[in-house]
Amino acid sequence: MDNSIHSTDGPDSVIPNSNPKKTVRQRVRLLARHLTTREGLIGDYDYGFLFRPELPFMKKDPRAPPFFGLNEKIPVLLAFILGLQHALAMLAGVVTPPLIISSSLSLPSDLQQYLVSTSLIVCGLLSMVQITRFHIYKTPYYIGSGVLSVMGVSFSIISVASGAFNQMYSNGFCQLDEAGNRLPCPEAYGALIGTSACCALVEILLAFVPPKVIQKIFPPIVTGPTVMLIGISLIGTGFKDWAGGSACMDDGMLCPSATAPRPLPWGSPEFIGLGFLVFVSIILCERFGAPIMKSCSVVIGLLVGCIVAAACGYFSHADIDAAPAASFIWVKTFPLSVYGPMVLPIIAVFIICACECIGDVTATCDVSRLEVRGGTFESRIQGAVLADGINSVVAALATMTPMTTFAQNNGVIALTRCANRWAGYCCCLILIVAGIFAKFAAAIVAIPNSVMGGMKTFLFASVVISGQAIVAKAPFTRRNRFILTASMALGYGATLVPTWFGNVFPQTENRDLEGFENAIELVLETGFAVTAFVAMLLNAIMPAEVEEIGAVTPMPVSAHDNRDGEAEYQSKQA
């Protein structure tokens, strides 16, 4: 891959052989010069811009910092700082899904720590694939987008996993103790990742479908409400943890357990206060924080909550002390299997991931000052979706749930004006190192539920807003309002009352028929799957109303409407 300097005025593509290849000797000389000179190590970048808070009495600098394109030379220190900023921006999103999924299965703390470590390592390794972009030999196809797009664990799988686990505990796939509490069930996690590995083939096939066709089949009026329902179904998880945890909500129980350092009843004011502290800290970072604080405000809020919780005695250090010094992929394994009822919902997850990937990479290209139309752009989209699918297969084999392209990092690019891939590589390296040090994962697992709940509530609400932003791209005609109403009515209902379809089918002793009925039941009790199906069906059969064509002005959908965030930045500086 040629990483030579390109002009920021023209398209910055990664087409092979676009520049003469350098010899190994020339590359070594350039690297040595980059690492041994002040220009290469520090440069003349205004580092104060990243750390300067926006306080009311401080004078704002009207000058915009320089823009670093995809392949431009960038100082080593700046690449590391911005890589750290990208890593912090995605940290909460990377560790939250494995924490929720492992808690749903009552997995022991050592397995939870392993999954958090593996999540960080896998995200770092697979993000490198997405950022680098590989050409498939003797084909017009690529693997990877070639831009600063990072991979993270998909939130969409949490709702499917939660419903499937409930079904597994009720049908005997997983066991309960005499009191009705869930026993650890690693077999269920193996079924989840095994089914995901098979269903990821759907997204791989979608990568070879032209993006325009995908967007026609899954327009914003379909994907928007689906993403909204994913976030809505997860907010309840955050609120339960905010009040102490989902496993101790019954009367007379203490949270998180009777053996915890400071056990309290669910909903105690101490728990509410800790979560509220995290929530308020996030707001204060966004209002008064420096650019580097704004992009990682969720992590800073979590850190503030952890400090106060530790000072008040809510932390348990036993698991941290018992954790190994290092961890890696496959240190622990799970028995892989395919759970039939999960197939259809997980296929829906990968379709949503493909649609999200197209939108995220389009936004990344725009803020990176790259073309957002034409052959090169379409090849980036194809490579990104293909990398999404392949990475999900690899992630499943590495004991991790499905992966998707993260959108948080587009905000970091727009804010810092750095789209350089070397900042992305530094981000990947930081994630991998953080995952290898198992004590870091153990510290995350030991964070009190109320602190995590305040962070999760904010994080999952941002998923809802992302869905609303997608819906806003479609004109609000009568037809679209009807599709939204019908699809979200059933989706909301299934989310609020997830057991509404549980007694429709009679009991049967036919195992094959029971498996088919369980699959239908799981789909209809998963809110976002219901919304996606109804929206797709109505969008296909509902004709456009002639009197509304041209009468409604669509909201702008082009990513050029806020080119690389510069207009937003300048408006803030004014």
UniProtKB/Swiss-Prot annotation:
Result, substituting residue 417 to K: Does not significantly affect substrate affinities
Stated consequence of mutating residue 408 to E: Does not significantly affect substrate affinities at 37 degrees Celsius but has no uptake activity at 25 degrees Celsius
Membrane-crossing segments per the record: 77-97, 111-131, 141-161, 188-209, 217-237, 264-284, 296-315, 338-361, 427-447, 451-471, 482-502, 522-542
GO cellular component term of the entry, any: plasma membrane
Modification after translation, per record: Ubiquitinated by hulA. Ubiquitination leads to internalization, sorting into the endosomal pathway to the vacuolar lumen where uapA is eventually degraded.
Protein keywords: Cell membrane, Isopeptide bond, Membrane, Transmembrane, Transmembrane helix, Transport, Ubl conjugation
Family from the record: Belongs to the nucleobase:cation symporter-2 (NCS2) (TC 2.A.40) family.
Name of the featured protein: Uric acid-xanthine permease
Species of origin: Emericella nidulans (strain FGSC A4 / ATCC 38163 / CBS 112.46 / NRRL 194 / M139)
Organism ancestry: Eukaryota, Fungi, Dikarya, Ascomycota, Pezizomycotina
